[in-house]
Structures are given as C-alpha cells and as structure tokens.
Amino acid sequence: MEHYISLFVRAVFVENMALAFFLGMCTFLAVSKKVSTAFGLGIAVTLVLGISVPVNNLVYNLILRDGALVEGVDLSFLNFITFIGVIAALVQILEMILDRFFPSLYNALGIFLPLITVNCAIFGGVSFMVQRDYNFAESVVYGFGSGTGWMLAIVAMAGIREKLKYANVPAGLRGLGITFITTGLMALGFMSFSGVQL
C-alpha cells in the first residue's frame, strides 16, 4: 500500500505533468482564466487519464506487447495509433456525458474538450506507463495521480490569473507574458519536491 501512496504523491507533485514535464500546456494556458472552468477541465483530464492509462495498460499487455497474443509476434509498432484510438474513444464518451448531464460545463470548455484527445499530457501519461512497465494497479494509481497533479496545477494557475487581473502588471507583460513567468515560478516551486525521496 505504501508503494501506491508513494507513486500517487510522486505523480502529483514530483512528476507533475504540467509543471515538471510541461505537457498539456496549450489547454493549460488557454483555459486557466477562471477557476471554475479550469476545475471542470481538470476533472475531465483526470477522468481521461485515470481511465485511459489502465485501459491502455491492458491493451498493451494483452495485445501489443511482444508475445502477448502469439509467441514471436510483436505488435508494439501499433502502440501510438492504438493508444490514441483508445484516448479518442474515451474523450468522445466523456464529451457525450458532459453534453447530456453538465451542459454549462460542456459549453464553457468549448473546443478544448475534444482537444483533450490530442492533449500531450494524456499521451505522455500512457507513454510513461509503458516506458516504466507499470502493472495494472500501478497504472490506475499513476493515471489518477497524474490527472490530479495536472488539475492542481491548472486550478492554481487560474486562481493566480484571477488575482492578476487586479494587479498592476507592466504593459509589456500583460496577458501571456505574465502567465509564462507565473508558470515558470510555479514550476520552480514544484521542482522543490524533486529532492523528496518516497
């Protein structure tokens, strides 16, 4: 149990998708203007990561890995296209659920909801799972931990950006300039967790 808690904490803080690997920055910067919208997208990304990493773990271990289906047959060259297909299917299901049950969040996320399919944080989580050879339980913990870390980063950024609206920011730094500086400072803060041994 301690191993899984350590893996979750490491995925949230030490190996944060947004602030350690800078993955998913397009939606991170575009949707982090309001806390409510950022939280909604963070939940969506967490759900997609939390489901797609273990599902892709099963697909990889039962079908694509060398010798999984038939001894001597290696289908690992299909990794990328298969993983993207699974992620796209999960995002479409999530989009239908949000449209049906949470129309205000669906409208607030707009074009960024289908873009979760090509969000490199999602694909990065799946790729790290394969690279690190996680088992199914580890991939569940890692998927939800990575999503939680990304959500924590985007909600914190949205909170800071809401406060920056009332700050006296120099004219040359208004907008994305101060946002990039803030992201860098947040990344430095999260970098302090890198020395923590769990």
From Swiss-Prot:
Keyword field contains Transport: yes
One GO CC annotation: Gram-negative-bacterium-type cell wall
Main location: membrane
Family, similarity comment: Belongs to the NqrDE/RnfAE family.
Record organism: Serratia proteamaculans (strain 568)
Topology term for the membrane: Multi-pass membrane protein
Protein name from the UniProt record: Na(+)-translocating NADH-quinone reductase subunit E
Function: NQR complex catalyzes the reduction of ubiquinone-1 to ubiquinol by two successive reactions, coupled with the transport of Na(+) ions from the cytoplasm to the periplasm. NqrA to NqrE are probably involved in the second step, the conversion of ubisemiquinone to ubiquinol.
Domain of life: Bacteria
Signal peptide limits: none
Pfam families linked: Rnf-Nqr
Keywords: Cell inner membrane, Cell membrane, Ion transport, Membrane, NAD, Sodium, Sodium transport, Translocase, Transmembrane, Transmembrane helix, Transport, Ubiquinone
Location in the cell: Cell inner membrane
Subunit structure: Composed of six subunits; NqrA, NqrB, NqrC, NqrD, NqrE and NqrF.
InterPro entries: NqrDE/RnfAE, NqrDE/RnfAE_oxidrdctase, NqrE
Enzyme Commission number(s) of this protein: 7.2.1.1
Enzymatic reactions: a ubiquinone + n Na(+)(in) + NADH + H(+) = a ubiquinol + n Na(+)(out) + NAD(+)
A molecular function GO annotation: oxidoreductase activity, acting on NAD(P)H, quinone or similar compound as acceptor
GO biological process, one term: sodium ion transport
Broad enzyme group: translocase
TM region(s), chain numbering: 11-31, 35-55, 77-97, 110-130, 140-160, 176-196
